């Protein structure tokens, strides 16, 4: 459903959704089964100093944030994150080189975003995370033969998450224990990279 968290570090409020397997119905009326897909027009009323992240690009009119999902999508892959999230952006640029029909290489560009609580901004190693994400985009486009389908790609580190991460289309949520606030072992970095690449692979599968 929709999870609300008050950060004990600064009393700021954060929201995010987790709908897998069948909890979208806790937030909006739907037939909550993965074989029944729909398009969506989403509108969220939120404080204007909040960041709202969803599957598609978000536009604001006053205190209402809106987005649309104009392709058929299962309800469990719809996502919303809202709050005073710290934001870092980048862009992946590459090409599709392994088309099954042998077509010429296709130039591609995907906007990337990484988000975390404001109180964790000092610990967010965004450059490393972007590097690993871009390496994943390079590898998958080199081997899968189909371009990334969801426009932009955001990764949001969220608190009190009850799994490792969730492959919401274009709006992946990840447990914020992966924002390391003290020296981490090589194993922890490997586990985080594995999670990042696992969720990115879900954008194709």
Segments (PLM) and residue ranges:
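Hydrophobic helix-coil surface modules that form long, contiguous segments used
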Residues: 17-24, 29-197
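Compositionally biased, intrinsically disordered low-complexity segments enriched
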Residues: 5-6, 20, 101, 204
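Active-site His/Glu-centered metal-binding helix of metallohydrolases
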Residues: 196, 200-205
């Amino acid at each position: 459903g929709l999870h609300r968290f008050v950060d004990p570090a600064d009393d700021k409020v954060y929201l995010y959704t987790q709908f897998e397997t069948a909890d979208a119905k806790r937030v909006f009326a739907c037939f909550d089964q993965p074989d029944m897909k729909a398009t969506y027009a989403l509108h969220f009323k939120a404080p204007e100093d909040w960041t709202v992240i969803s599957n598609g690009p978000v536009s604001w009119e006053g205190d209402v944030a809106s987005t649309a999902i104009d392709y058929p999508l299962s309800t469990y892959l719809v996502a919303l994150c809202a709050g005073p999230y710290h934001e870092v952006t980048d862009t992946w640029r590459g090409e599709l080189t392994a088309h099954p029909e042998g077509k010429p290489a296709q130039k591609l560009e995907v906007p990337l975003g990484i988000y975390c609580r404001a109180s964790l901004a000092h610990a967010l190693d965004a450059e490393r995370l972007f590097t690993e994400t871009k390496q994943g985009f390079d590898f998958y486009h080199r081997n899968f033969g189909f371009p990334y389908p969801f426009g932009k790609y955001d990764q949001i580190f969220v608190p009190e998450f009850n799994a490792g991460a969730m492959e919401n289309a274009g709006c992946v949520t990840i447990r914020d224990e992966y924002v390391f606030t003290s020296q981490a072992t090589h194993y922890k970095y490997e586990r985080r990279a594995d999670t990042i690449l696992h969720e990115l692979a879900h954008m194709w599968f």
